[in-house]
Amino acid sequence: MLKALFGDPNTRKLKKFQPYVAEVNLYEEDIEKLSDDELKYKTVEFREALDKARSDAETEEILDEILPEAFAVVREAGKRVLGMRHFDVQLLGGIILHKGQIAEMKTGEGKTLVATLPSYLNGLTGKGVHVVTVNDYLARRDAEWMGQIHRFLGLTVGLVQSGMNPEERKKNYACDITYTTNSELGFDYLRDNMSTAMIEVVQRPFNFCIIDEVDSILIDEARTPLIISGQVERPTEKYLQASDIAAQLEPEIHYEVDEKQRNVLMTDEGFEKAEQLLQTTDLFDKNDPWAHYIFNAIKAKELFLKDVNYIVRNGEVVIVDEFTGRIMVGRRWSDGLHQAIEAKERVEIQKESQTLATITYQNFFLLYPKLSGMTGTAKTEETELEKVYNLQVTITPTNRPSSRQDWPDVVYKNEEAKWKAVALECEELHQQGRPILVGTTSVEKSEVISRLLQSSGIHHNLLNARPENVERESEIVAQAGRKGAVTIATNMAGRGTDIILGGNSDYMARLKVREYLMPKIVRPEDDELGAGVTGWVSGREKPQGFGNQNGKKKVKTWQVSPDIYPTTISQETEDLLKKAVKFAVDQYGLQSLTELEAEDKLAIASEKGPTDDPVILKLREVYNQIRREYEVLTSAEHKEVVELGGLHVIGTERHESRRVDNQLRGRAGRQGDPGSTRFFLSLEDNLLRIFGGDRVAGLMNMFRVEEDMPIESKMLTGSLEGAQKKVETYYYDIRKQVFEYDEVMNNQRKAIYAERRRVLEGLDLKEQVLVYAEKTMDEIVDAYVNPELPPEEWDVENMLDKAKQFVYLLEDLTVEDLGDMTVWEMKTFFHEEVRKAYDLKETQVDKVRPGLMREAERYFILQQIDNLWREHLQSMEALRESIGLRGYGQKDPLIEYKQEGYEMFLEMMIDIRRNVVYSLFQFQPQQQPQAV
């Protein structure tokens, strides 16, 4: 009704941006006529215009003015370097991103190319643009591939990957445009705020950020805080004992499992049984606490399942990301939970960790003055994106209309029947020759369907978090659209390679060149990391994915399965390929490049960009020849697959979020291709079991049907949608709560990090310490002297003793020196005395080495900030866990948390001040003996 009256708000937004697109198109003809050098010179002209800006607002105005011409320049560079021209809808996407909004673009509409437009425009300011993807592979691919446009136009392009040392990170963050992942960005921010000298800081002030798969990072990952932790010793035998006890406790009798809240509650019988087994009287005994260990052991037993939430690899428990299905090497669950799972699996129990620094993605990305993002599916979460991040969602139209068919869901009574039906559908469509993609929600489920297909003799590829499959991810996806291909994938969200019907000839040709080239020119991995990296990793907290986890070097191989290629290359082409590789070795040297450098060369060779490197030109020639040979078959196969109906996507369980279901569906029917999707469900699926409630169970009894008979009913589909909406609302509330509580921490974090940065930059630390000292003296006076009482009742003697404890250089002061001063006069007197004492202290310290006092000031302030902030984080965590109980006393827990958290923060700031003053006055440096 409202739409009819006011028109669709999305259409209104697009209408507002349309004039920009028209202007870009007007520029196109003139810009086509420019030579390469003239095109590159446009960057210089744009920068000169931006140099005139005197404020951020003026900069934005100039960016809007030059936008049409700048976009036309990028479009032309794209044609020349990559052979790709931005469609009008891609220009629209670029404008939406530049305006700090979220562009919703369907799969296959070229999101990666869209990002080049706003990143070039905003990169012109020189303040840095961060393009964020969900994993290292995609960041590297985009930096190598799309980065060619920016490099051609004269902008610098950086790439930050796990495993890089601080110098490399700093250099890459200093570039105009930096490609990286959300976790690298977040951990670098936290590490920068733990560094002890400006030279260690790797990031610049934040400016503009474009997030690819924005919903995955800002919504799915929002509940996960980024944590850098140090190790604490805890007795491992307690974890093992707790695990044995949990194994003897029974659900419903000794404890209840709340799957919705992912929590366990022990019953009175449970407490009695555990105490009896432990031969103790109180699980909460302060001197020998057991409750925490037992709770974690039960959680590990009931809520964390092997091959679903984690896998065991090389004797280690490795987390599986529930949203992407990828393994998260180096990440650990906190609060002793990871140790409880290690005890359950009987692998080596690693040390427990203590939080040193933490931030949630929600608050991290809000640090950017301008934020934008791209995704295929954001409309379902529009309210949250607008409320939390102040980001509007604008849907861009597709370049070609979609011709995908979404068939209705079929529901079976139990899982076994569902899996059989999935296998049967695969068999039928496979016989027709249609490519099929089966999406599963866990490693375990993907292996169930894999076994069923094996027993039917259907050849298929498996893509899940198991390491042997991860390595081949891009190869598997590149051929998932070939005739008769069957691919099983765990949580397909965010898999960066498109499924092209008939197979991806460009990618296959690149794989073939890589097979021959890489073993000859890439340096073996042992030489890859210099001592600098290792030293840094051990000196600072180890971020995820650093180094090899079990010390054994895996020999890298570039061989791929011969089945991947549509045909074997001709002898003539193979000879040409061998010659090109030999030429590369002659020019670069045998095994002389890092893998990143080699991938970079190959990326340029696989495109059309201008280059003077004779090796790249030779490789490009052979790459194009291989591609042409493959294309003969892939284009014929493309036609065949289109006639058969395109890719068929099978979903095997509704995800907690409709958005992830839509992402899976979006794999079929890209760029106007035909395709179809269907979901196979069972009443035993998690979503229905946990959130469907009694309604679904009632429906199940109504349908007195055979096990293998599918149920199709509008009522049931309605219940499913309802369950999903319930889950989405439930998780939205959790994220909102995380956000509200973390907002309290965020304000404190900003204050403490700003203070830390001021100290790091060393802006007049002496004056800062003197202010600390004066405030400390004021607090001592206020503690012992009450101005409302007569002077004879003032405790002047103890006040003096306390002042001397802090500043021993005041030891000559006596009660008589204070005479009959007023409170204000006493404070002024102490201010003067403490300044004199500090000058005296400085003279003593600087005798040992000139300038030592300045170093000591920085060292002690940073040391106190870090130590007390670390303790404060633990206290705030404890407060947060206990504050929920206030709700029972008719008090709002959030308001109580804000109030108490603020008081604790003020106390911490006072402690920092006092400890710094005390430490500096107690500091007694030793004179270094002179070398003879």
UniProtKB/Swiss-Prot annotation:
It is an enzyme of class 7 (translocase). It is a peripheral membrane protein. This is Protein translocase subunit SecA. Monomer and homodimer. Part of the essential Sec protein translocation apparatus which comprises SecA, SecYEG and auxiliary proteins SecDF. Other proteins may also be involved. ATP binds at Q90, G108, E109, G110, K111, T112, D498. GO terms for cellular component: cell envelope Sec protein transport complex; plasma membrane; plasma membrane-derived thylakoid membrane. The keyword Thylakoid applies. One of its GO terms (molecular function) is protein-exporting ATPase activity. Its main location: membrane. It comes from Synechocystis sp. (strain ATCC 27184 / PCC 6803 / Kazusa). CDD domains: DEXDc_SecA (cd17928), SF2_C_secA (cd18803). Part of the Sec protein translocase complex. Interacts with the SecYEG preprotein conducting channel. Has a central role in coupling the hydrolysis of ATP to the transfer of proteins into and across the cell membrane, serving as an ATP-driven molecular motor driving the stepwise translocation of polypeptide chains across the membrane. Belongs to the SecA family. Pfam families: P-loop_SecA (PF21090), SecA_DEAD (PF07517), SecA_PP_bind (PF01043), SecA_SW (PF07516). SMART domains: SecA_DEAD (SM00957), SecA_PP_bind (SM00958). Its EC number is 7.4.2.8. It is found in: Cell inner membrane; Cellular thylakoid membrane; Cytoplasm. Keywords: ATP-binding, Cell inner membrane, Cell membrane, Cytoplasm, Membrane, Nucleotide-binding, Protein transport, Thylakoid, Translocase, Translocation, Transport. InterPro entries: Helicase_ATP-bd, P-loop_NTPase, SecA, SecA_CS, SecA_DEAD, SecA_motor_DEAD, SecA_preprotein_X-link_dom, SecA_SF2_C. It comes from the Bacteria. It catalyses: ATP + H2O + cellular proteinSide 1 = ADP + phosphate + cellular proteinSide 2. The keyword Cell membrane applies. One of its GO terms (biological process) is intracellular protein transmembrane transport.
